[in-house]
Amino acid sequence: MDTVYIQRTAGWFKPALALIICLAAGGIQSFAQSQDDVTVAFLYNFARFIEWPPGSFTSGEAPFTVGFVGRPALAEKFARAVQGKNVGGREFNIRNLDDVSGATACQMVFIGEEGQTSAVLAAINGKPVLCVGEGEAFLAAGGMIALSRAGARLVFDVNPGAITAATLSPGEKLTKAARSVKGG
């Protein structure tokens, strides 16, 4: 009798396990999508909470340009999210940067490709460009705002010293909302 019970269990176990694996995979994809949505919201708010110095734009009508190094799908999602919105009266212009030299023409750059961090930071050194990346090591490398996960939440850390070195002014809202403020 016990053998029959085990055989019946084995009959539903494999399909149930397959269903659980499929649901978990969908949950992982959903988590990644929701993390991208939060990243988009963070980037939009970073643009609002930083002050750029006079002369940061080529003209009074120039757009607010956001460059993405790596993560083209995130760039597309950001472009859709900010369509019809502006920051400081300026429309958004979204660019995928294949060459890091294009970063100097942006007001904000998101580095989604770890191998490019040093090159982008060198290209924008001393220029009024907000540089956002991922992971705590990003700040240690000279980045300005680093996104990272804390459990299921996406959080950010701020390096105000790097921000002010770029002649930008971090707003109080930015530093208060950060998980931590490092480097000055």
What are these regions (language model features)?
Residues 2-19, 26-184:
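Short hydrophobic alpha-helices and adjacent helix-cap/hinge residues
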